[in-house]
Amino acid sequence: MALNKRNINNIFYIFVTTHLILWTVVPTITNSNLPLDTIEALAWGSNLDWGFNKHPPLSAFFPEVFFQIFGPQDWAYYFLSQIFVVISFFIIFKLSQEILNDGTLSLLSVFLIEGIYFYNFTTPEFNVNVCQLPFWCLTVYYTWKIYNSKKIELYDCILLGAAAAFGILSKYLFIYLLVAIDLLFAYLIFFKKSKKFDFKYLVSLEVFFVILIP
């Protein structure tokens, strides 16, 4: 029987809820201590700065927020990590729907992502890799919207700039994705000439640098 849109959405919600609960409860029960990267993030968060020689500040900021709310409860930091993963699943699901225009294939896309090591077994350890996931997905999503749209929307450019900035504030190596995006649009505009330069592109850069200036 073919799946309708409502059934697909219900399956997706059941899946992400199951993932959230499973990967929060299991490490809470089985681990005697928090993972080392999470402990390190909590230590940095207690003396939060705009950046460290090893990592940017966001991977320390979010654990510190949860520490202020929940205190030294291990489950809270496993839960925090899964929130980031689940948000990524929502973005991937949305992006897949726009690209594939097929609900079943979009659902399968999320299932395939779940099978990747970095979206399951390593996710209880909140670190820069987990922290960057939703911002990476958002950056790709809004890049796709700008690339695929005949009329570029200003808010897409604003959100792209914000997602890219928060990505850099999550992990320094996020810059590789941004360089790849810049090279793609430079090629499309100046060499292939399949797209025209739009000053709205500069809005993304402005938002990006405004967020990073502090």
Question: At which residue positions do the language-model features occur?
Answer:
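Membrane-interface transmembrane helices that cradle and orient dolichyl/undecaprenyl
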Residues: 97-100, 139-156
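Start-transfer (signal-anchor) and selected internal transmembrane alpha helices
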Residues: 1-23, 200-208
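Short acidic/glycine- and proline-prone juxtamembrane loop motifs at membrane-interface regions
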Residues: 121-132
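Transmembrane-lumen/periplasm boundary regions of multi-pass, lipid-linked membrane glycan transferases
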Residues: 166, 175-214
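Transmembrane-helix signature of polytopic, membrane-embedded enzymes
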Residues: 10-13, 92-115, 133-134
